[in-house]
């Protein structure tokens, strides 16, 4: 008699034979009554769930957030009080690639964090860049379509990408970062993370502050060149997963220094830029980063599917002391992320173990697909509505945010009017040394291969407005790499396009 567990069906019945199907005779057909075979095949048919529409390829690990600084004057959030230690889950990802995409591709890296606080889950869903390609969420689906496959060729389209970017000058800041060294990191241990959006802090006195979150890698930065990345992909498509998993297994726990930039609420009316614009950064000279703690990743998941693929991060998950802002992109993500999880994982995705809060949960949600938590979470089956007289959960007024002053007429305002989309990319470009600029030029030229000349010229016009050297450098790189000549190629394509 073995001491190993007995194999069973999903209903718990022991399985006598997992090697041979039930047939009519030794060579006969399979019988429909072979419920073991039918269960096994039907389950296999349903093993895959819809992949994320964006950020599909990802890597994750558990860790701890430790707060060492004191920002208690700005926020009442317990997770951010001095000495607080909070378990957390991180998921990194590429944006455009599907689940089977190679890790070593030039792309923005997602930087999503879930903190299991004593006041509920707090999710910070950012990237390895402090800005993004668009500032109005109405353009987000259009942008993502340019990063995905062409509906006819089923290939990624450089033309679609550069056409959209060249028609969207607000993308210049992020495009410059993407095409720089930091657009192709060797792995995720050597990248920074950013909340990207402007969030808010608020304290017991009812004071609000605007805040930006930064996570600075303590491992330093490492990047591939395009040529190096091609060699890496030739060896393995899982370079980032291999690196992160192996490092943690070997006790080489990656760490990030956690910083915040804090802006008094009324300063938002005084800055020369819109502090709620996702395509802009706050100058460090005006709002210096404050060190508040360290994030460490120190444990690999036991099962990737249940703990990383099933993980659901949403900016709507906040805790008392942390709030939102008028950032338009953030406002849209508050809805869209949770809605995407309901589509991908089901109505009750927050009851999946990796998404469950560590604190008690009480609410009046009921029924629905995959309701596996035993009914409404009120503690009393008679308290299935609110208000009630049967000791059901009640509100906590102390969790109420201070009032937010808003003004203006409802309208579809042109977000480009009065917006400077060139100064901040120029400041970034001026920080690059000569070698970094040359790699920027070469990377852009490589990414523009096959793009029609009239689109190239439109984009070069934007680069020139950033800095004449930017435009000249990319133009030369295009000629060196592809023999591009605006006087011939662009002119012919303009005529073709007009016809």
From Swiss-Prot:
Q: Which GO terms describe its biological process?
A: hydrogen peroxide catabolic process; response to hydrogen peroxide
Positions contributing to heme binding:
337
Stored Gene3D superfamilies: Catalase core domain
Its EC top class is: oxidoreductase
For bias kind Polar residues, which ranges apply?
A: 7-23
| Reaction it catalyzes | 2 H2O2 = O2 + 2 H2O
Grouped into one coarse class, the protein's main location is: periplasm
Q: Does the keyword Iron apply?
A: yes
| PROSITE patterns documented for this protein | CATALASE_1, CATALASE_3
Q: Which residues form the active site?
A: 55, 127
Any idea where this protein resides? Periplasm
The GO molecular function terms of this record are: catalase activity; heme binding; metal ion binding
A matching Pfam family = Catalase
Protein family according to the UniProt entry: Belongs to the catalase family.
What is this protein called in UniProt? Catalase
* Gene behind this protein: katA
């Amino acid at each position: 008699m073995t001491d190993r567990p007995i194999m069973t069906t999903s209903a718990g019945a022991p399985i006598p034979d997992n090697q041979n199907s039930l047939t009519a005779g030794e060579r006969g057909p399979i019988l429909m009554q072979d419920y073991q075979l039918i269960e096994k095949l039907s389950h296999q048919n349903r093993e895959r769930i819809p992949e994320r529409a964006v950020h599909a390829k990802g890597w994750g690990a558990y860790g701890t957030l430790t707060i060492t600084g004191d920002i208690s004057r700005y926020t009442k959030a317990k997770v951010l009080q001095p000495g607080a230690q909070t378990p957390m889950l991180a998921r990194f990802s590429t944006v455009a690639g599907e689940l089977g995409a190679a890790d070593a591709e030039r792309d923005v890296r997602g930087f999503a964090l879930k903190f299991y606080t004593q006041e509920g889950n707090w999710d910070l869903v950012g990237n390895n860049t402090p800005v993004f390609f668009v500032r109005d969420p109405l353009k987000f689906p259009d942008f993502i379509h340019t990063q995905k496959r062409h509906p006819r060729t089923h290939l990624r389209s450089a033309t679609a990408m550069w056409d959209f970017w060249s028609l969207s000058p607000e993308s210049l800041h992020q495009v410059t970062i993407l095409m720089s060294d930091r657009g192709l990191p060797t792995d995720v241990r050597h990248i920074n993370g950013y909340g990207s959006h402007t969030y808010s802090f608020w304290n017991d006195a009812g004071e609000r502050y605007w805040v930006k979150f930064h996570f600075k890698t303590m491992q330093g930065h490492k990047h591939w060149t395009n040529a190096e990345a091609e060699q890496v992909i030739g060896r393995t498509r899982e370079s980032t997963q291999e690196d992160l998993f192996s490092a943690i297994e070997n006790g080489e726990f990656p760490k990030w220094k956690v910083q915040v930039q804090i802006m008094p609420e009324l300063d938002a009316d005084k800055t020369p830029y819109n502090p709620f614009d996702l395509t802009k950064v706050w100058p460090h000279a005006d709002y210096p980063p404050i060190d508040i703690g360290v994030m460490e990743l120190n444990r690999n998941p036991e099962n990737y599917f249940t703990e990383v693929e099933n993980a659901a991060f949403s900016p709507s998950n906040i805790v008392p002391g942390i709030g939102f802002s008028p950032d338009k992109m953030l406002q849209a993500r508050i809805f869209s992320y949770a809605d995407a999880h309901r589509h991908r994982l089901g109505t009750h995705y927050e009851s999946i173990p990796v998404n469950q809060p560590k604190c008690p949960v009480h609410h009046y949600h009921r029924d629905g697909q995959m309701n596996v938590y035993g009914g409404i979470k009120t503690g009393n089956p008679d308290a299935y509505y609110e208000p009630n007289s049967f000791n059901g959960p009640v509100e906590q007024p102390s969790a109420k945010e201070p009032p937010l002053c808003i003004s203006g007429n409802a309208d579809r305002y042109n977000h480009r009017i009065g917006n400077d989309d060139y100064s901040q990319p120029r400041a970034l470009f001026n920080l690059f040394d000569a070698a970094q600029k040359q790699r920027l030029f070469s990377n852009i030229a490589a990414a523009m291969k096959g793009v029609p000349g009239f689109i190239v010229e439109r984009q070069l016009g934007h680069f020139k407005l950033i800095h004449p050297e930017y435009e000249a450098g990319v133009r030369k790189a295009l000629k060196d790499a592809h023999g591009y000549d605006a006087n011939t190629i662009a002119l012919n394509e303009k005529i073709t396009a007009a016809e």
